Structures are given as structure tokens and as C-alpha cells.
Amino acid sequence: MADKALYVVGQKRFVQTMRKAGADMQELKEVNRRAADIAKPEAVARAPRGKTGRLAGSIRAGATQKAGIIRAGRKTVPYAGPINYGWPARNIRPGTFVNDAVASTESQWAKEYETFVKKTMNQIKGA
């Protein structure tokens, strides 16, 4: 429950299209990492802080060929998921700090994808 990801709508189709266009999928993984790295500081800033600040300290960026990922929590911070997404049975309201951070930085990380798409399209013969 501690590792959560926010996926962009249409990301799967985007990856399929880029693969068909001959895009370097390792390069797409790097673009995904840069996008996650852009949103990470905002997620850290928005994370609720208690006495220790362990939740904010557990936030990290990652990437696959399919998505950039911001993870919060680990074994020593198992409450990250309930704090971000809520837990109705325990009367914990969602804080959505990771989701809000990704949404608020969209204009910045979207430029990374735009640059990647333009570069890939320029490499396609006849485009």
C-alpha cells in the first residue's frame, strides 16, 4: 500500500505509439525519470510533516519505460498510502499530496514529453 503511482491518461497508448514510431524506449525511460524528478520536490514540499518528517523523507522518484513514478513510504513509513489516499474505515481523509504535486507541476514535466515526441517525429522518415 505504501508504493503508489499516478498514471497519465493515455500513457499506455502514448508508449505504444512511440514504440511503433521507432522511439528509443530507454530514452523514454529517461524522459519518464526526468518528469518524476520535476514533480518530486513539490511532493516533498506538500507532504504532511510530523515530528520526524519521515513521510517527506520517504518520497522518491522512479521510472519505467511506461511511466514516471513518485513513491512515498517504505517498510518504516507504512502510513504513506493511507495519508495520501485516505482510509475510510479508520476515518482518515485523503490528503492527495502526491497527486496534487504531480498536477501542479504538469506544465513543467509535460515539456519533457513534448520535446521527446518532437525529437522522435523528426527521426521518422517522411514525417
How would you name each of these model-derived features?
Residues 1-77, 81-127:
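Short, Lys/Arg-rich flexible segments
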